[in-house]
């Protein structure tokens, strides 16, 4: 069963899911790792229970759990079939189902064999969002989930925006935290721009050292490991060097707004000694750099 903890609502996404409830397409929630997809599934499960759906009508499977991660598609099908209640509509929730080989066969079989409403999450570590419709024969609707908006950032961190009046009568918006300490709106927005909108930040507060440590872990997982793993599964043998990928990312980030070419990326990295790690000899080919840049664009 999907584990539970304190859930913070993401109403804009939850309302989209509710709008597609009990419709034929498979609901696929996509987005970057750690952006809140699993929590959205839990919110939808809670909504169903609050509106009268019985717990036994809901089947939840999290494929990051040790209970399920070694299952085959046949195992998943049998697990669900054993829990189907005849004459009842079932609600199936699959978190990171794409870890299972031939997962789409099981999902398509559920649609044919049972009266069910299906919800699936998937990160870019396994499939690009454009690939889901292909695997599900076009019978899916995608909910693209993003990190927190600024409004959500305020809510998650317990900030309250109030309109106050200055001594001269001017109205302005100020922000108050849970302890009623007051901040200028631009201060909080600066924190949002610096730390970003990953929901997990709310669990550690806005202490810079903790936040940066958390973000570094997310960056290493999302940008480096996920891209390398996905491209390896897709047979892209050129994309195997995490150091080169990280350097290309840093180069592109440092040159936002500038015109750069594929050739200039490799040349600059070598000329500035950024690839002098004792492993890579010479300038990476334009074809190799292009493959890494394409992987970043698609992720």
Task: Write out the residue ranges for each language-model feature.
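Interdomain hinge/linker elements that couple catalytic modules in large macromolecular machines
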Residues: 161-299
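Hydrophobic positions on the alpha1 helix immediately C-terminal to the Walker A/P-loop
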Residues: 40, 44
């Amino acid at each position: 069963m999907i584990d539970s903890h304190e859930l913070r609502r993401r109403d804009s996404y939850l309302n989209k899911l509710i709008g597609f409830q009990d419709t034929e397409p498979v609901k696929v929630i996509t987005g970057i790792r750690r952006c809140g997809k699993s929590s959205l599934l839990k919110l939808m499960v809670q909504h169903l229970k609050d509106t009268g759906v019985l717990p036994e009508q809901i089947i939840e499977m999290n494929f990051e759990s040790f209970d399920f991660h070694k299952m085959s598609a046949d195992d998943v099908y049998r697990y669900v079939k054993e829990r189907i209640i005849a004459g009842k509509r079932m609600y199936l929730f699959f978190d990171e189902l794409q870890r299972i080989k031939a997962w789409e066969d099981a999902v398509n079989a559920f649609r044919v064999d049972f009266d069910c409403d299906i919800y699936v999450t998937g990160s870019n570590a396994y499939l690009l969002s454009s690939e889901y419709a292909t695997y599900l024969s076009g019978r899916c609707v995608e909910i693209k989930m993003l990190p927190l908006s600024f409004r959500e950032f305020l809510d998650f961190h317990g900030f309250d925006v109030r309109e106050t009046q200055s001594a001269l009568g001017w109205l302005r918006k100020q922000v108050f935290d849970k302890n009623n300490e007051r901040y200028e709106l631009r201060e909080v927005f600066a924190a949002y721009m610096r730390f970003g909108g990953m929901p997990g930040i709310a669990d550690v507060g806005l202490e810079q050292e903790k936040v940066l440590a958390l973000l570094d872990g997310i960056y290493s997982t999302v940008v480096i490991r996920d891209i390398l793993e996905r491209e390896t599964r897709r047979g892209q043998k050129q994309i195997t060097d995490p150091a080169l990928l990280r350097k290309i990312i840093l180069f592109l980030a440092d040159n936002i707004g500038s015109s750069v070419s594929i050739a200039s990326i490799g040349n600059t990295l070598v000329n500035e000694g950024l690839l002098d790690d004792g492993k890579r000899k010479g300038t990476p080919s334009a074809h190799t750099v292009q493959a890494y840049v394409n992987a970043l664009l698609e992720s």
